């Protein structure tokens, strides 16, 4: 029904956010990508793409991409019944936040992908935004902080990822000699994951009336590097439990507010119709989350 070249052009532009990056991925010219997307729009009789920076799908574009992805997964699963799986592997995508990937999801991926029959693309974004990748059709699942789903998707509560405001013992001795208060928190280096990250901002505002924009901030957009930066005394920030609970108990990390915490509720959103292999993957995610996350 749809020309494969036109279909891939649209999907890659949405996935990469630009015609230029899509062209590099498809190994064709930017003009060719533009022509293919435009031809598909003419064929459909509607606009499928918002040509902005980054490029985004229209509502009609989202519906089409979801439909195309569903067809792709169903075709792959069907062909796996007749062709050597080594030659024809199922590929799908999931959107997840960095802290979930680093703190509890990786064991699921390791177990599920052992067979070599499935190839996985992981889209990383803040937990408040991962659902957008699912809505746009780029992924078939998303770990997100949003409870509400859009049409044709279902949601299951995974639990809560708990965070504590912490720093290293050496950092504490240097910056918090006079206690943990508005002034000491404002003047000491604060670690922030990225511009979308509101964990520190919300915690400081709610507990100290302190706005993040008047703090001295380091931005470190990598979960493992962020955690190490706290451990090495570069700054203070929100640390996930239970991964770093032992560090707090052993006093390698100092809990700056023992009576306060931040719990981020996480949900798994997924397409209503899924293949047996994806159902198994979903069940493994739910089981692992409920072992690690707070109820």
Predicted regions and their residues:
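A short LG(V/I)-centered, amphipathic sequence patch enriched
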Residues: 41-59
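Flexible hinge/capping segments at coil-to-helix
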Residues: 155-191
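Hydrophobic hinge/microswitch elements
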Residues: 210-255
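Secondary-structure junction motif
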Residues: 186-210
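A late-sequence structural motif
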Residues: 258-295
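Short helix-boundary/capping micro-motifs
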Residues: 11-27
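Central regulatory/effector-binding core of bacterial HTH transcription factors
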Residues: 88-151
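Alpha-helical linker/hinge and terminal dimerization helices associated
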Residues: 43-44, 64-86, 92, 285
């Amino acid at each position: 029904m749809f020309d494969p070249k036109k279909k891939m052009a649209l999907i890659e532009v949405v996935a990469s956010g630009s015609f230029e990056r899509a062209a590099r991925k498809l190994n064709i010219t930017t003009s060719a990508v533009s022509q293919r997307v435009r031809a598909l729009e003419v064929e459909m009789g509607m606009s499928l793409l918002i040509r902005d920076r980054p490029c985004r799908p229209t509502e009609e574009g989202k519906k089409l991409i979801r439909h195309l992805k569903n067809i792709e997964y169903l075709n792959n699963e069907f062909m796996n019944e007749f062709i050597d799986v080594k030659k024809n592997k199922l590929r799908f995508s999931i959107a997840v936040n960095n802290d979930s990937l680093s703190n509890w999801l990786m064991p699921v991926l390791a177990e599920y992908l052992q067979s070599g029959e499935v190839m996985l693309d992981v889209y990383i974004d803040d937990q408040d935004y991962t659902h957008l990748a699912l809505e746009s059709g780029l992924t078939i699942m998303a770990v997100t902080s949003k409870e509400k789903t859009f049409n044709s998707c279902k949601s299951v509560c995974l639990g809560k990822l708990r965070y504590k405001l912490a720093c290293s013992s050496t950092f504490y001795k240097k910056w918090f000699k006079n206690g943990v208060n508005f002034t000491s928190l404002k003047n000491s280096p604060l670690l922030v994951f990225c511009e979308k990250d509101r964990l520190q901002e919300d915690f400081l505002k709610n507990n100290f009336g302190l706005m993040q924009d008047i703090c001295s901030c380091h931005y470190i957009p990598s979960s493992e590097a962020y955690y190490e930066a706290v451990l090495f005394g570069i700054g203070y920030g929100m640390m996930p439990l239970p991964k770093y609970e032992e560090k707090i108990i052993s006093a390698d990390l100092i809990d700056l507010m023992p009576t306060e915490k931040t719990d981020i509720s996480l949900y798994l959103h997924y397409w209503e119709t899924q293949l047996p292999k994806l159902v198994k993957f979903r069940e493994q995610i739910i089981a692992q989350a409920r072992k690690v996350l707070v109820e």
